[in-house]
């Protein structure tokens, strides 16, 4: 499969979808990452509301954790999606220390096994932060096995240094982040329905680096903004609801997320504003 795509050009230098080469989030936003504890704690009071999200059709879902995290970090999200009638699994590769040798190969094998086990039903891929890079790239490699891709705070369209985690990446992976970024066309969307969930108050990843630019090759892409921290976005009730809503769409009948009506306009700001 060739990794080419007709990416729409930005309308002007102020276009929100311009490739982000700016600085990472400010020290103030980074200090506010402690909000993740509140986001985790808010799952319990919001649980009855979360249970009103659409119920799925039982297709398989794989969730990829962020940098240095393991499947333990995605337990709240995976547990919730299990109640929405999905066959959910973690990535089963321990801690995510970057694109080590064999990581993508193991991911490919896992997706194929899930695809076959489900009777050749396509698999939805969800990735938190760096895990979203894996989800996107694996979907590019194997679109015939993948139903949709959803990323949470994933920096795929910005310069490597536009995150506050690039030094941690180099330390844990032993690799140069610029070299790794050049190996892939990260801003290019996979050829499947693709959703990027991001937050302008992300203290680790510059939010502009999580914006999916419009694509002529794949019109089924979107950005959903939530109010969340980076470390808590995978446990944030608004993000969890959006994930469940996206997964519940009938295969082959993708529609963009409806953020208008009721409280949605407050919980999900306009990402293009």
Where are these regions (language model features)?
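Serine-dependent carboxylesterase/thioesterase catalytic core
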Residues: 59-72, 76, 82-91, 100-192, ...
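Glycine-rich phosphate/ribose-binding loops and adjacent secondary-structure elements
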Residues: 94-96
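A generic structural signal for short coil/turn motifs at secondary-structure boundaries
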Residues: 98-100, 232-233
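Helical cap/lid subdomain of alpha/beta-hydrolase-fold lipid enzymes
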Residues: 140-273
